[in-house]
Amino acid sequence: MKFLKRGVALALLAAFALTTQPAQAYEKDKTYKITILHTNDHHGHFWRSEYGEYGLAAQKTLVDSIRKEVAQEGGSVLLLSGGDINTGVPESDLQDAEPDFRGMNLIGYDAMAVGNHEFDNPLTVLRQQEKWAKFPFLYANIYQKSTGERLFKPWAIFTRQDIKIAVIGLTTDDTAKIGNPEYFTDIEFRKPAEEAKVVIQELNMNEKPDVIIATTHMGHYDNGDHGSNAPGDVEMARSLPAGSLAMIVGGHSQDPVCMASENKKQVNYVPGTPCAPDKQNGIWIVQAHEWGKYVGRADFEFRNGEMKMVNYQLIPVNLKKKVTWDNGKSERVLYTPEIAENPQMLSLLTPFQNKGKAQLEVKIGSVNGLLEGDRSKVRFVQTNMGRVILAAQIARTGADFGVMSGGGIRDSIEAGDITYKSVLKVQPFGNIVVYADMSGKEVVDYLTAVAQMKPDSGAYPQLANVSFVAKEGKLTDLKIKGEPVDPAKTYRMATLSFNATGGDGYPRIDNKPGYVNTGFIDAEVLKEFIQQNSPLDAAAFTPNGEVSWL
């Protein structure tokens, strides 16, 4: 397949319309039924959750039933992923997501966008994952610097009935910023919106599809307000010629894109209720939250070159809510009827699940003394476990200091060998490590608020590289890394997504321009830190009265 050089293609944009003009294979005045199914941000959740939610076995049952229904009505199905198959569940991470890709094969995925977390591993791992997958990895806007060539297929062509459908893959150019830089030495991430214009032109000149769809990993931001993130799907849709894409199957921001009103998503979407997708500049935009919690279903009618959406829904995959009864007892109940797990998928995945569990018992490091994480300590005083966790987050983010709720530390680690299971007992919640760049004045305001969190509560803060004296709601002698805070200087703070979004009453920082969600799970970050720094010296992390409350 030959592709036009970028500059030539851009120059031709002014001369050619982006609407498709195919050599038509479809019948005039005939209505075709096309169903697009989609998921995104799978993050290693090939197995059901501890509450029996989602998982690829139930997803296969659901997708199979939809395929059967659509086929009975004379229609066709295309199944797409918005990327980020990697990173999030130890049983998957330890096996380079092999169970996830093999499970996706069995379900019958047609294509996926390459997400930023596909680059959490070296490129050799991603190439191995391509070999496991029986569907193409699409990424139009990543190039090899040394050759100027694309590293992945920019698009794939599918024929459904007599309709020629092109699917483009695009990924956030933030990947270079939030990923591991050692893997990007010869990789260039170009602006996806600009690359989309080039690719659409290439397609219309060379392939002449009837329909063009983009599967993306760029994020959905209400009204295009992307803050410090790179522009997402909304911004791209607005930048393209109207209707040049039939739809964008998105990912990255991990939202149910269910609109409450124009340019505003529902804040707390309830599973099983109606979901109105976004539409910008004649282009539908969809996203199915995360982890396989939903399968998105978009039913289209194609007639005489036009794609019309006639139905859209997010279908929950065994999602449950916690209900407390009058007698005080509580249980988790399904939002919608239960979806049975597919036996063939269970047969495929069970050995991987068992292998992953066994690997959790493997030694990852050691420590020469107790790392104190007991509830009776972390909610009252600074502890060496808190310092180790925050040191790991600081190392991963390049932060100047770190803060987190003591209640997020759930266990101690005894002297001796450390296993991954030990780490997961300390940090079992799967929070994301995040950071924010703030002015010195903002740091003072933030830490003053955090210092109000009282002992004997989960909100009591564990801190690293911070010293102060707190008295009567004010801080004195506040220092970061031993130096007084400069109001005009910029500081980077590492914390967890839970606290960043206001958890435990902490000030929200996820709306700040300098906020970045790294996507890295807290336990994985701690595990890597232990591996790189073992044997740990417990005494080296012992607090020394840096912070005090009078």
Swiss-Prot record:
PROSITE patterns linked to this entry: 5_NUCLEOTIDASE_1, 5_NUCLEOTIDASE_2
PANTHER family noted in UniProt: 5'-NUCLEOTIDASE-RELATED (PTHR11575), PROTEIN USHA (PTHR11575:SF46)
Keyword Nucleotide-binding: yes
Swiss-Prot/TrEMBL GO biological process terms: nucleotide catabolic process
Protein name per its UniProtKB record: Silent protein UshA(0)
UniProt xrefs under CDD domains: MPP_UshA_N
Residues involved in substrate binding: 429, 498-504
UniProt organism field: Salmonella typhimurium (strain LT2 / SGSC1412 / ATCC 700720)
